[in-house]
């Protein structure tokens, strides 16, 4: 490999939510964290070089995101990585994917309307939807009948997809996505597809952008910040299907939100990542796949009842512990007090009996995490 991901980067004292903010969520300081979904790896070298060059310029005035360098970087990335043509005339820009989601929900729903999601559900969705006074209507991941029934209800206005799915790492098939599109059209429901994990799909699986399936009212919302690990720079972009909705989104961002000018370093990072970061992304994805295989080997060797398989996308190990019959609260006490690690409980995503272990990190840390989880489970079974 060209890049060495085995060397840990010390993130303590950098205002990191994962490392320095762990005590606020888990009630104890100094824990080894496997929590919020960012990685411990430094950004791709081409991104760092581009940022350094832009900082050296020294002027950070108001910036236009609707420039050809950014548009063409997005267009070419989708063309090469996803064999998909993007209409850059339908691009929008916002500080974050959740910011885009909130804006679209204000456009397409009213307080009290329902937004349908697959469960377990990313907790950011719950906060965004509930915070706007809309109802989050969950349906199980593998229950098409429940999805159809939920979308057919009179107050359902939006199908909110997570593609690939967080927290499970599920990659939707072409048949599934086409089915969602047909069902949404039949029920008169808009579709918002959050595809921030799209570029971290593992071998043997393929992500298909919603632009291939969208009918009527729809939007794809995404960002390079997740796969290339620069979320603190902010910045996201999307594709809005209908011309009138696209114009309305841009108008709202530039007027009501006052967000016409993006963070220039985010634009620089996106362009550099999409133009020169592909090799780094391929290597970090392969490295993380090794971490996930390590987790599977350790867990399944210790607990034959689990038969855990790595996710199809991402660096978050979503682990079903229900076969072991372990109490969630007892497990968290063992992890925090006994092992001094922070691992997200499944209850955060509406799924008691699961945990979500972030292994976007050096192998030594991944080994420490799965080792701690295995020991804690061993004491409780």
Identify the meaning behind each predicted range.
Residues 267, 271, 288-296, 308-321:
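Conserved glycine-rich beta-strand-loop-beta hairpin in the small C-terminal domain of fold type I
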Residues 132, 186-187, 339:
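Helix C-cap/helix->beta junction micro-motif
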Residues 325, 334-343, 348-381:
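PLP-dependent enzyme catalytic core of the Aspartate aminotransferase-like
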Residues 216-289:
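Conserved core segment of the aminotransferase class I/II
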Residues 60-183, 199-214, 219, 371:
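Conserved core of the PLP fold type I
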Residues 2-96, 103, 273-274, 380-381:
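N-terminal small-domain helix-loop-helix segment of the aminotransferase-like
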Residues 117, 138, 191-193, 343-345:
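Hydrophobic residues in well-ordered beta-strands that form the structural core
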């Amino acid at each position: 490999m060209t890049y060495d991901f085995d060397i840990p980067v010390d993130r303590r004292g950098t205002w990191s939510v994962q490392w320095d903010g762990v005590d606020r969520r888990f009630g104890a300081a100094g824990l080894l964290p496997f929590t919020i979904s960012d990685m411990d790896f430094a950004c791709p070298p081409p991104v760092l070089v581009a940022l350094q060059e832009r900082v050296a310029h020294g002027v950070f005035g108001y910036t236009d995101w609707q420039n050809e360098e950014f548009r063409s970087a997005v267009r070419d990335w989708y063309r090469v990585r996803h064999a998909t043509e993007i209409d850059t005339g339908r691009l929008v820009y916002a500080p974050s994917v959740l910011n885009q989601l909130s804006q679209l929900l204000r456009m397409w729903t009213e307080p009290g309307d329902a937004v349908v999601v697959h469960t377990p559900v990313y907790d950011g969705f719950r906060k965004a939807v509930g915070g706007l006074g809309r109802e989050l209507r969950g349906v199980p991941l593998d229950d098409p009948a429940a999805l159809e029934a939920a979308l057919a209800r009179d107050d359902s206005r939006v199908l909110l997809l997570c593609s690939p799915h967080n927290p499970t790492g599920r990659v939707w098939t072409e048949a599934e996505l086409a089915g969602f599109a047909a069902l949404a059209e039949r029920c008169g429901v808009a579709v918002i597809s959050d595809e921030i994990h799209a570029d971290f799909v593992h071998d043997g699986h393929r992500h298909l952008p919603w632009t291939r399936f969208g009918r009527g009212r729809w939007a794809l919302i995404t960002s390079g910040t997740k796969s290339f690990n620069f979320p603190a720079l902010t910045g996201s972009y999307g594709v809005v299907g209908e011309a009138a909705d696209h114009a309305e989104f841009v108008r709202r961002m530039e007027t009501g939100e006052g967000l016409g000018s993006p963070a220039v370093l985010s634009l620089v990072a996106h362009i550099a990542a999409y133009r020169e970061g592909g090799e780094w992304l391929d290597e970090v994805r392969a490295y993380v796949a090794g971490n996930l295989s390590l987790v599977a080997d350790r867990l399944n060797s210790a607990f034959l009842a689990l038969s855990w398989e790595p996710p199809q996308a991402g660096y978050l190990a979503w682990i079903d512990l229900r076969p072991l019959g372990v109490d969630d609260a007892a497990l968290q006490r063992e992890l925090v007090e006994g092992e001094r690690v922070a691992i997200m409980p499944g209850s955060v995503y509406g799924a008691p009996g699961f945990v979500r272990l972030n292994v976007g990190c050096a192998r030594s840390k991944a080994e420490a995490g799965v080792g701690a989880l295995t020991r804690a489970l061993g004491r409780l079974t």
